[in-house]
């Protein structure tokens, strides 16, 4: 977006002054970032031509598309048609040495690091200043255990670095029960585990991947289900539940195989959809997001259950879930463990001041290590507009209050920009600094909001 500040319009009073008018909206959101990026990796490792339909085109996905091209793969993107074509080479990477730049894309950063670290070659990886601040050591430690040399070009455990990966085992060796074991700590990011899962079956190594922590298991579920859709079924070891968030000290047993090429439909982005469902809740109106259903691969659909506890009603329809906000947006306070849908912690925090009692969010300590220190950012910005907040190690409590005018700092974090835009729909004088940071996942967000 060209403007440096977005002025949010208080539309609450306007909506409820029009007595008798049906208050409803339907919106369409772009494809899921998480699914698009996983599908890109699975496609490049597949046994032939893949077509991804409904793909997201954002900063993150464009970085990953460029990285795949830089590795020598045939890949074409048609943004108008929302379609990406990738020619997989049955797990082979065309080049033996390459430099890739992942920008601020966390999935590209973690997934490509795991893949390249398990494939013979010399790989130079770099990232944006924002991504350079985010941790990589838990994943790099696993690669080092498997014999990959890591040469840091800056701070240890962070981008940039060079991976020197040794040749994978021969087919004969891979067939033996000389299984290797690595343990990955997912306290800061479940992407470390997802990355190893996707890459391991094409690595020439039989791996047992042990897991420390339970953060982000909804995203692990997504990864496993998508691997299954592409023809590889990870074997769960004792301690890993089928239910998101129930994983213990278990893991996954991975053998060798090849992903199947296919035409793959990308789901709408439920993370993006949640802003519009929260808007319907906040304004006390009816909202539908096309193509969003409760059987989604995406864990953020659980956010709608939290909105139900705050007084909303939801209904499945063939076109998508419809949410009815409570009369005049009279939300109830709630205590919510959001470990399975932590990307929506900012969304809930942004509408929490309008609840009739405190809103307590738990299970989100890991969001301190994302695009920004999101826990600190939430507290800082709510305090800036006059809302009382109490923080703790794994969450925070937000107390009811009417927000004052103020400019919301976004910290180059797309979710801060989109989430806090909701606060201004029932308050005067709320501005969003740097709305253009939404390019990371949803460049047209403020146009759709308008």
Regions found by a protein language model. Give the residues of each.
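Structural preference for solvent-exposed beta-strand-turn elements
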Residues: 1-450
């Amino acid at each position: 977006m060209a403007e440096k500040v977005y002025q949010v319009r208080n539309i609450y009073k306007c909506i409820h002054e029009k007595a008798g008018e049906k208050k409803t909206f339907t919106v369409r959101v772009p494809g899921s970032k998480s699914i698009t990026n996983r599908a890109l990796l699975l496609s490049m490792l597949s046994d032939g031509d893949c077509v991804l339909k409904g793909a997201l085109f954002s900063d993150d996905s464009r970085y990953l598309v460029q990285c795949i091209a830089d590795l020598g793969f045939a890949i074409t993107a048609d943004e108008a048609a929302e379609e990406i074509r990738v020619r997989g080479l049955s797990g082979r990477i065309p080049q033996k040495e390459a430099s890739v730049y992942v920008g601020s894309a966390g999935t590209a950063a973690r997934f490509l690091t795991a893949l390249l670290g398990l494939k013979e070659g010399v790989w130079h990886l770099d990232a944006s200043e924002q991504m350079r601040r985010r941790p990589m050591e838990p994943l790099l430690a696993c690669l080092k255990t498997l014999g990959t040399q890591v040469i840091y070009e800056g701070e240890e455990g962070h981008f940039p670095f060079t991976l020197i990966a040794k040749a994978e085992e021969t087919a004969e060796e891979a067939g033996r029960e000389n299984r290797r074991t690595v343990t990955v700590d997912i306290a800061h990011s479940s992407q470390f585990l997802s990355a190893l899962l996707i890459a391991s079956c094409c690595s020439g190594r039989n791996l047992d991947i042990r897991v420390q922590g339970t953060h982000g298991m909804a995203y692990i579920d997504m990864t496993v289900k998508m691997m299954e859709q592409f023809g590889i079924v990870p074997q769960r070891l004792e301690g890993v539940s089928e239910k998101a968030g129930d994983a213990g000290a278990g893991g996954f047993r991975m053998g060798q195989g090849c992903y199947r090429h296919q035409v793959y439909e990308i789901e709408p982005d439920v993370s993006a959809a949640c802003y519009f469902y929260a808007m319907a809740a906040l304004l006390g109106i009816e909202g539908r997001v096309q193509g969003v259903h409760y059987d989604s691969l995406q864990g953020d659909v659980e956010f709608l259950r939290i909105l139900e506890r705050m007084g909303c009603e939801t209904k499945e329809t063939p076109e998508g879930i419809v949410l009815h906000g409570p009369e005049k947006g009279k939300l109830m306070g709630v205590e919510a463990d959001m470990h399975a849908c932590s990307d929506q912690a900012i969304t809930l925090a942004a509408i929490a001041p309008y609840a009739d009692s405190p809103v307590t969010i738990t299970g989100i300590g890991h969001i301190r290590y994302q695009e920004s220190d999101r826990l600190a950012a939430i507290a800082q910005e709510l305090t800036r507009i006059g809302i009382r907040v109490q923080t703790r190690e794994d969450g925070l409590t937000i107390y009811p209050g009417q927000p004052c005018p103020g400019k919301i700092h976004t910290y180059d974090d797309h979710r801060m920009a989109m989430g806090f835009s909701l606060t201004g729909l029932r308050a005067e004088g709320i501005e969003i600094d740097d709305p253009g940071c939404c390019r990371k996942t949803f460049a047209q967000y403020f146009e759709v909001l308008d």
